[in-house]
Structure formats: structure tokens, C-alpha cells
């Protein structure tokens, strides 16, 4: 990897999307409503070859706040809230059964949160059974994954997940340094995570992911490298190493973080440079902008073939799926639309009580949106772009259609961060760290001064 010129690199740090969707969630609007979603369901059900389904269920509850977290969560310790939520999930599932063909093949199944394992094993089993009764056609090679908080994970949880066919677990680790954990209000010793991982391995879980975050308060390069040494002892198959997005104007809990303890941009870049070098020496290959996988892992093999895809859950080898979002604040996607459920429980429940799908907002994509989405997702996933693939799919002359955008990439080429070739362009290893910046050049919605986004570095 090129050595980072920190002074020059700092100029690229500006607010920008992470492109888990395009158009991004800030473009979702209330013009996309329940009827819009029902129409989208009908259109997709009646395609000649309907896409497989990906089911995402949001389980929003947490016992206490982790100050770094930007997820949609509800803090509670009340058992009755969980019981009530399950009853409303069942109402939503019944409405989905009437609104779409739920007998289509299911290729992916994911529990996110919140803390999914804050629900008891019996409750998790009840939720899973309810979903499987409505969506019964699980593929033989289905990916079933669940986010795990090691502080709320028991053998009984693992037994339930195993019995229901889960084969992928993602552990929220963040950092093993106690001073960092204290600053972000999430104490979980190495031994706790070690015990959870051993439990998963004992049950034959073959795909284990760790979520790590750099840029947290009290972090240093030396401290984070020590965390990575501990990580290697647990031998995860994949790592997601996120740049901490400090957006206290969006997430109030982040205001509890002492900003004087946050590492500087230069410190963050040093951490990033060192972690990439460390992980690659340990045989973890960089995937896209923030994931790592062992060289024999399916993610890396898909990257070699330029077949990776990116969605709200990260990177996947599944080419195209229609995501059905279930639960409060969950997001669904169908290639030509996005939909999001109500973000607060009151409106979510009220819609269901009235017999309506709890759609708060979304967006129907124009043909131009679909084209730009494909370009941006190819860049975000594979760090390169083959013009011919876009031209064949959309019947466009890429260089003519994106003449202005390609001109805007020239400075990256001059800086040695990207190279053009006869087929298209490819980012260098260091340039891949700026993939968000480069993707922004193809975003037709950016208006400048995007303060609602986190910084790209």
C-alpha cells in the first residue's frame, strides 16, 4: 500500500454518504407510501424471474446506551415492551402475507438491532417461527445471520439460533481497550467475547464476523493494534472495521462523548494505515472500503471476480435480492425502490392497528437513478468499474453519459489514487480509502455542504 501523505490526504475529509443505498436515505420522502409499496410488490411478484427475497427484521431494544451507536434503538428493561413488540411484528407479517407473494424463495435472513439477543431465547424462537410460517420457502443455502452483543448472549440463545438454522453471527466488539470501552459506555472484557465466540464455534457456526470501530475516544494507534492482536486470537472469518461517525446533531447519545478525547484526523489516518497493514500481514484481505476477509473466504473470492454487492447489512455475495424490511424503522429495497417503516413505535403500532403496512417514507427510482445506483454500488463493492458491464445492462455510452463525472475523477488519477485503463478505471489500495469521495462524483443529489452526513475520513 502507498504510504499516506497525511497533509494531502486531509483535504479529502468532508461530509459524504456511506452509500448503503442510492439515492441515500435523506432522499426518502412521504410521497412513497403504502400504496407505492403494494404496487412495487405486485410488479416484483409478476416479473418473469422474481428475485430471491432477503428478510431483514429490526429488533430495536437495548438495555442501555452505547454512546458511539448510530443505530435506531429503543432503551428499555421492560419485559412487556418486548412482548408487545412481538405481537405487532405478527400483525405486520399478516399484512405482508396479503400484500405480496410470500412463497418466493428466501436467500437471506437477518436480525439487526438494537440488541436481538436482548429478547429471550423463547422470544427469538417465537419471532423466527412466525416469520418462517409466512415466508416458508427458505433456500437450501440460505444465509441466516444475527447481530450479537456478547453482554447479552447465552448458551440458550445459541441453541435457539442453531435449531432455527442460523449459520452466521456478527459480534459487536468495537475495541478491547478498557479506557475506550469506558468512554463509549460499553464494557465487555476480552474473556467475555472469547467465551461467546467459543460457544458459537462449538455449535458449528462457520462464519463469524467482528465489528470494530476506529476513531473512538481514547483510541491510539498502539492501542488499536493491541486490540487487533486480541482479535486474531479469536480467529474471526470476517471483520468490519468502521470509521466512527460522530454525528451528535443526529444521535443525542453521542453528545455524552467527550470530544476532546476523540483522535485527530491525522491520528485516525495513522490508525487506518496501520490496521490495513497489520491485517493484510495476518492474511485478511481488504474488501471494499471497510471490510476484511480471509483470502479463502467467499467475500474475497467474489471480490476477485468483481461480483460483490453492497446493501444495508454490508457486503454480500448474493447478486440481486429483494429486501423485505420487517419491524420498526426497517428498510426494504427492490432494485427500483426503497421503503422505510416508521421510526417510532407509536406511529408504527398505530398504522398496524389501522390495518396498514407501516410505511413512513421511501423513494421510487427513475431509470437514471437505477443507472447511477449500479455505478456507485460497483465502485463501493469492487473499487473499480468496467464500462462495458454498465453499457450492456443500460444501453448507454458510458464515457458520453458520464463525461462530467469522469473529468471530476482526473484529480484522483493525478494524485495516484486511481488509474484509467482500456476497460474503465480502478482505484489503488490507498485510493480505495477514498471510494466514498469518488462515488460522490456520480451522485446526482448532492448539493454541497452535506452536513447531515459523517465525514469520509
Curated annotation (Swiss-Prot):
Pfam families: HemN_C, Radical_SAM
This enzyme's EC code(s): 1.3.98.3
UniProt keyword Membrane, yes or no: no
Amino-acid positions noted as binding S-adenosyl-L-methionine 2 in the UniProt annotation, renumbered to this chain: 68, 114-115, 174, 186, 211, 245
Gene Ontology terms, MF aspect: 4 iron, 4 sulfur cluster binding; coproporphyrinogen dehydrogenase activity; coproporphyrinogen oxidase activity; metal ion binding
Pathway(s) served: Porphyrin-containing compound metabolism; protoporphyrin-IX biosynthesis; protoporphyrinogen-IX from coproporphyrinogen-III (AdoMet route): step 1/1
Keyword field: 4Fe-4S, Cytoplasm, Iron, Iron-sulfur, Metal-binding, Oxidoreductase, Porphyrin biosynthesis, S-adenosyl-L-methionine
InterPro entries the record matches: Coprogen_oxidase_HemN, Coproporphyrinogen-III_oxidase, Elp3/MiaA/NifB-like_rSAM, HemN_C, rSAM, rSAM_horseshoe
Cofactor(s) demanded: [4Fe-4S] cluster
Subcellular location: Cytoplasm
Cofactor binding: number and manner: Binds 1 [4Fe-4S] cluster. The cluster is coordinated with 3 cysteines and an exchangeable S-adenosyl-L-methionine.
UniProt-annotated binding residues for [4Fe-4S] cluster: 62, 66, 69
Domain Radical SAM core: 47-279
GO cellular component, one term: cytoplasm
Residues the record lists as binding S-adenosyl-L-methionine 1: 56, 113, 147, 331
Catalytic activity: coproporphyrinogen III + 2 S-adenosyl-L-methionine = protoporphyrinogen IX + 2 5'-deoxyadenosine + 2 L-methionine + 2 CO2
Keyword Disulfide bond appears in the UniProt entry: no
Family: Belongs to the anaerobic coproporphyrinogen-III oxidase family.
Oligomeric and partner information: Monomer.
Function: Involved in the heme biosynthesis. Catalyzes the anaerobic oxidative decarboxylation of propionate groups of rings A and B of coproporphyrinogen III to yield the vinyl groups in protoporphyrinogen IX.
Protein name as catalogued: Oxygen-independent coproporphyrinogen III oxidase
Gene name linked to the record: hemN
